[in-house]
Swiss-Prot record:
HAMAP family: UPF0180 (MF_00506). The lineage of its organism: Bacteria, Bacillati, Bacillota, Bacilli, Bacillales. This is UPF0180 protein Bcer98_1118. InterPro entries: UPF0180. It comes from the Bacteria. Belongs to the UPF0180 family. Pfam families: UPF0180. It comes from Bacillus cytotoxicus (strain DSM 22905 / CIP 110041 / 391-98 / NVH 391-98).
Length: 79
């Protein structure tokens, strides 16, 4: 299965993805995202100026406003 990076505050999402058989990595720093097929972030630390370096070649899913099930569905459709 896919390697999914998930922000550490999203424990319910981490558990749900693990139950679906994905390898879940807790995102603590930018380097954690480099080997991930997909990353799930809270969106709270969005870059206000719109300038950012790409740390991952995989999809990035912003969890803000989504349920755990919706996030899992998005992950499944992107990996």
């Amino acid at each position: 299965m896919a390697k999914i990076g998930v922000e550490s505050s999203l424990t319910d999402v981490q558990q749900a993805l693990q139950q679906k058989g994905h390898e879940v990595i807790s995102l603590q720093s930018e380097s954690d995202a480099k080997e991930c097929d997909c990353c799930v972030i809270t969106g709270q630390d969005s870059n206000v100026m719109g300038i950012s370096d790409v740390s991952t070649k995989g999809s990035v899913i912003k969890a803000s406003g989504l349920t755990t099930d919706e996030i899992c569905q998005q992950v499944e459709s992107r990996v």
